[in-house]
Amino acid sequence: ALNVSNQDIAAFLGGLPEAKMHCSVMGQEALEAAIFKYRGIEVEHHEEDEGALICSCFGISEPKIRRVVIENGLTTVEQVTSYVKAGGGCGSCLADIEDIITAVIDEKETTAARIAAEISEAQIRKPLTNVQKIALIQKVLDEEVRPVLIADGGDVELYDVDGDFVKVTLKGACGSCASSTATLKDAVEAKLRLRVLPTLVVQAV
């Protein structure tokens, strides 16, 4: 149940109009909070209150808008308003929301282009030795994975490398987050497979 996303909820209901997608977001957050409370686990909140306030009408910050845009692949201001209500009041923040969306899209395109170039380069490289593989894994974790997790209150540490199995320790918010499995696969394993070897498997210890 902890792996249920707002998109899963919307799909289970047979699809929701965009104007009602904020209900699925609220439902997912409520489900997560209820499960954590039942298990006696303190809920790890996203660091939304520490970012710049974008929509004063509904109290929505820049980090929350960025997170929702990234997680749901949003491309328009109207979609953001449907998902988190930001921009649905006085409208003075619409330009700021558009800037956030543009920045996220630009980042994705830049990352995709860089990854494509790196994959092409990797295809002509000689096979990595164990020492080279471990060093490259550590480099990718330090430079590309950890900064993203730290920004969201978490962290990851390389524990061991056994063949193609990369063992890591999740820390901070990532250690108790309901989405820790998704973090391993999407944020850590996917990045290492692209940057180091496509056969790597990441495991938490």
Swiss-Prot record:
Q: Binding residues for [2Fe-2S] cluster, per the UniProt record?
A: 55, 57, 90, 93
Q: Any idea which GO molecular function terms this record carries?
A: 2 iron, 2 sulfur cluster binding; iron ion binding
InterPro entries annotated for this entry?
BFD-like_2Fe2S-bd_dom, BFD-like_2Fe2S-bd_dom_sf, FSCA_dom_sf, NIF_FeS_clus_asmbl_NifU_C, NIF_FeS_clus_asmbl_NifU_N
Question: What is written in the cofactor note of this entry?
Answer: Binds 1 [2Fe-2S] cluster per subunit.
| Top-rank lineage group of the source organism | Bacteria
Q: Which cofactor does it need?
A: [2Fe-2S] cluster
Q: What keywords appear on the UniProt entry?
A: 2Fe-2S, Iron, Iron-sulfur, Metal-binding, Nitrogen fixation
Q: What does the record list as GO biological process?
A: iron-sulfur cluster assembly; nitrogen fixation
Write out the function statement from the record: May be involved in the formation or repair of [Fe-S] clusters present in iron-sulfur proteins.
Family of the protein in this entry: Belongs to the NifU family.
Q: Give the protein name, as stated in the record.
A: Nitrogen fixation protein NifU
Question: Organism, per UniProt?
Answer: Leptolyngbya boryana (Plectonema boryanum)
